[in-house]
Amino acid sequence: MTHSVQLKILDKRLGSEFPLPAYATKGSAGLDLRACLDEPLKIEPDETCLISTGLAIYLGHSNVAATILPRSGLGHKHGIVLGNLVGLIDSDYQGPLMVSCWNRGKEPYTINPGDRIAQLVVLPILKAQFAVVEEFELTERGAGGFGSSGQN
């Protein structure tokens, strides 16, 4: 299934010096987002930086949203994750896409212009309609919370 997304290029290096967002493989769920920086950016341990992706998107339909997610290799190997953990892009947002990068590692890390820093995933959205009730239908789990379903 595909969904047409309008993309506005805000940094003219995208599409020439830096590739446009693309799926790395046929099975990829996320499109790589790149750092549109003018020079390398060193992120010290425990520091966060807001980095431009050089683009804006318009999803155009209320039944979709996009998420900005971390790249697993950056987090696992270098401690670079998203400062807000997950970025949510609403269907009617049209502004620039920015990535909050947080160095939770013990060493400084340098992001270079054009580096892949996050991934964008477009998702279908179901709108909730609440039905107020006095009691829920009983389930096996019930109100069991954290850890109540066991470890294995």
Curated annotation (Swiss-Prot):
Cofactors, names only: Mg(2+)
Gene: dut
A Gene Ontology biological process term: dUMP biosynthetic process
A single MF term (Gene Ontology): dUTP diphosphatase activity
Pathway as given in its UniProt record: Pyrimidine metabolism; dUMP biosynthesis; dUMP from dCTP (dUTP route): step 2/2
Catalytic activity annotation: dUTP + H2O = dUMP + diphosphate + H(+)
Pfam family, one: dUTPase
Organism field: Coxiella burnetii (strain Dugway 5J108-111)
SUPFAM superfamilies: dUTPase-like
Entry keyword set: Hydrolase, Magnesium, Metal-binding, Nucleotide metabolism
Record: residues binding substrate: 71-73, 84, 88-90, 98
Name by which UniProt lists this protein: Deoxyuridine 5'-triphosphate nucleotidohydrolase
Record keyword Coiled coil present: no
PANTHER family: DEOXYURIDINE 5'-TRIPHOSPHATE NUCLEOTIDOHYDROLASE (PTHR11241:SF0)
Record function comment: This enzyme is involved in nucleotide metabolism: it produces dUMP, the immediate precursor of thymidine nucleotides and it decreases the intracellular concentration of dUTP so that uracil cannot be incorporated into DNA.
Protein EC: 3.6.1.23
UniProt family annotation: Belongs to the dUTPase family.
InterPro entries named among the record's database cross-references: dUTPase, dUTPase-like, dUTPase-like_sf, dUTPase_trimeric
